[in-house]
């Protein structure tokens, strides 16, 4: 090998070594950057919760005590607020921070919403997910899903007679499908909204079934009366929602010998928010859904 060939090969080897080193440096930089980025987006969950609670606790306690004056139920609520927050995904926690920094995010003039029943629009939740590119093309960035939770067939009032607040109507999908849709929406800069029915439950709800069996704990979650005295007083001032199809605001239950308040349809029993257990449990249902 002559000197020229040796020099040429040496230069080639040095160039290859530099290229390999550069590639390694780039790879290392990308790895470090990815680690930093991952750390940056993982929120300090306990610290964030503690700060928010410290800021709001006095107002929250005052409002709760004005309504119920029950320390133990308030303590339970605070504990559950923390538990549900810890169960939120990092993606949702970061979305919380983003919205907290821009409290008027939902008032922007580019907010364009669309409301629909899932089955009428796309068949099921996965169908809605498949249509997101089309909706995004239409500049829709807020999806308002009409009631989709589990309801008794034939007695659903369009989905407003909820039998289970933690179960999607089977023909529409599952909670896993809902969480996947929410995640896909957020990744596309879209918001997901739902109707949360808090005034009443279906008579098929677990609470209503137990109340109908005479369980006092669950009867206290609704408005039960064994005669017409108080119902008649209500009827003097409470307007009727469906005066033609469902007249009156109370339904007689001959199997237990009581009237129950039903301001909508007879199969929708009004919840008694004078009972702190009702407020707490409905809030837990709300938080469960917000975590999807």
Regions flagged by a language model, labelled:
Residues 289-292:
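Active-site groove signature of glycoside hydrolases
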């Amino acid at each position: 090998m002559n000197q020229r060939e040796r020099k040429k090969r040496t230069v080639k080897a040095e160039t290859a070594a530099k290229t390999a080193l550069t590639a390694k440096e780039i790879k290392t930089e990308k790895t470090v950057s990815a680690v930093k980025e991952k750390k940056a987006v993982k929120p300090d969950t306990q610290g964030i919760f503690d700060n928010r609670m410290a800021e709001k606790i006095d107002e929250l306690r005052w409002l709760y005590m004005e309504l119920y004056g029950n320390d133990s139920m308030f303590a339970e609520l605070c504990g559950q607020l923390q538990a549900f927050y810890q169960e939120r995904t990092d993606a949702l926690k970061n979305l919380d921070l983003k919205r907290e920094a821009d409290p008027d995010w939902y008032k922007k003039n580019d907010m364009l919403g669309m409301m629909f029943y899932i089955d009428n629009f796309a068949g099921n939740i996965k169908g809605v997910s498949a249509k997101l590119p089309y909706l995004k093309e239409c500049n829709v960035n807020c999806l308002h899903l009409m009631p989709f939770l589990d309801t008794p067939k034939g007695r659903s009032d369009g989905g407003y007679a909820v039998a289970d607040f933690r179960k999607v109507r089977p023909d529409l999908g599952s909670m896993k499908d809902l969480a996947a849709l929410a995640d896909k929406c957020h990744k596309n800069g879209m918001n997901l909204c739902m109707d949360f029915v808090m005034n009443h439950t279906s008579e098929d709800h677990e609470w209503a079934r137990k109340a109908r069996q005479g369980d006092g704990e669950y009867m206290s979650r609704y408005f039960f009366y064994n005669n017409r005295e108080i119902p008649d007083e209500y009827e003097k001032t409470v307007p009727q929602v469906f005066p033609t199809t469902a007249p009156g605001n109370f339904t007689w239950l001959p199997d237990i010998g009581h009237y129950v308040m039903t301001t909508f349809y007879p199969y929708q029993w009004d919840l008694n928010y004078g009972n702190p257990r009702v407020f707490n449990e409905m809030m837990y249902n709300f938080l469960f859904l917000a975590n999807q």
